């Protein structure tokens, strides 16, 4: 898939989601969501999840230079004959993502952008959500590295928000909406940067 087409789909998502928020919650709420202060607060709050989601590919590349990686599905297949998760979801990557996300979470908790519980829940939820997304992609016969628009961008955020909501409390509605609205765009931009730097094989 061409990156320009991918970006167009995400732009369309932004417009449609914004319209839905406008219709349901009103113009004033949408304006408050997109205020720079709220955007900055939202990105800082979700940063542990972002870091946890982005780190596994880096850790896996570092580890596989000297050691063998261990896939989390142990090479097992589902009833459809396809792998449960695939070789790209490894214990090393999961551990690296968790450690990185928690470290960032602790720093943000020290600065009082998140609480101590969120410093753990957000990275763990993001990684579990990413595994759930990988499971769905394998069922759809989408190979590792191939794009699945919106699923790739929102699976880890959904996992982080769900785990946070189950075991702690979610932030203000404006923060949650900003995270869901802006994450696909942030995800694409950071992945493009990682691709340019040689950290990823594909720009999505």
UniProtKB/Swiss-Prot annotation:
Annotated GO MF terms: CDP-2,3-bis-(O-geranylgeranyl)-sn-glycerol synthase activity
Transmembrane segments: 5-25, 43-63, 91-111, 116-136, 147-167, 175-195
GO cellular component assignments: plasma membrane
Protein EC: 2.7.7.67
GO terms, biological process: glycerophospholipid biosynthetic process
Presence of keyword Cell membrane: yes
EC main group: transferase
Pathway connected to this protein: Membrane lipid metabolism; glycerophospholipid metabolism
Compartments (UniProt record): Cell membrane
Domain of life of the organism encoding this protein: Archaea
Catalytic activity of the protein: 2,3-bis-O-(geranylgeranyl)-sn-glycerol 1-phosphate + CTP + H(+) = CDP-2,3-bis-O-(geranylgeranyl)-sn-glycerol + diphosphate
UniProt KW keywords: Cell membrane, Lipid biosynthesis, Lipid metabolism, Magnesium, Membrane, Phospholipid biosynthesis, Phospholipid metabolism, Transferase, Transmembrane, Transmembrane helix
Role this protein plays: Catalyzes the formation of CDP-2,3-bis-(O-geranylgeranyl)-sn-glycerol (CDP-archaeol) from 2,3-bis-(O-geranylgeranyl)-sn-glycerol 1-phosphate (DGGGP) and CTP. This reaction is the third ether-bond-formation step in the biosynthesis of archaeal membrane lipids.
Family: Belongs to the CDP-archaeol synthase family.
Protein name: CDP-archaeol synthase
Record organism: Thermofilum pendens (strain DSM 2475 / Hrk 5)
Taxonomic placement: Archaea, Thermoproteota, Thermoprotei, Thermofilales, Thermofilaceae
